[in-house]
């Protein structure tokens, strides 16, 4: 079902003000659709601007259908990255074999990549004139009443909204305030990873290289005169760390990969010198419901599938459309729309999350024998 402009009068009640926390893919997509449904949209983002940086975003068949509805398909097509070739490499930097996939893997009709910042800009441009954006601020408290939900912001200001959407990522503040502590919903998958992007080509442009050791995974992805360095390691137990302490995270990566083979010493130097660094545990967010009262979660905040799914940005875009379709279907009845969103979209997210968990078993082999078998089917 498609959200249509004429649905606006039917969906927007007396209080048409909605607040979206987070201005990345989930937030921008939700802002787009809620505006189309006739709501007055405010987006609050803790950063001083859009959250730039990060690896390219995959646009597959399902996401392609959504961006067509948003009028972004042609622009994404025009900005897609060239198809890459990939190979597994040995410790001596010789090729171990091409990247292959199991024979039963479905081949999508559309399988594009686009730079994250490019897609972010396209989505922001699509909604920037139809929503109010408040940067360098965040939600500090929520106070729901029968008629609305009061929001206290970090700067001390207060305002009431009809609905609040948490589109603020795996460490969602909205989820913590409304649904409880993160630990209830985080499922650790036994790995940690870092992403660093350097403005130079460490391998041939348009190629990907993967190197494995037992319990270790390294990927180089080269495009547009830059290279993504992805370092991932297995851990049976969770490592205590502060997700806001970058120095601590850099130390963890350095210690985990010290003394490893291939080009890892060189790559660690690149990571150390770079200002681009992201680290987190590989986890999934699993919740029985993504809605509570006047609050709903979209994207990683509600159903993060982990980077192993290869569709974090896409899943957020698809999820925002699923929520909007539920609003349109039920003509703005929030209770029914939220129920529909939970019931209809849960099976999809569960399938994506299961696939991501299976991918990790192949990407990060636990034994030397697993490394060799992974050379055949990464």
Put a short name on every predicted segment.
Residues 49-65:
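Conserved N-terminal glycine-rich FAD pyrophosphate-binding loop of Rossmann-like flavoproteins
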Residues 2-18, 35-37, 60-197, 236-254, ...:
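Conserved N-terminal helical subregion
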Residues 186-190, 205-207, 262-279:
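A short coil-to-beta-strand element that immediately follows conserved catalytic motifs
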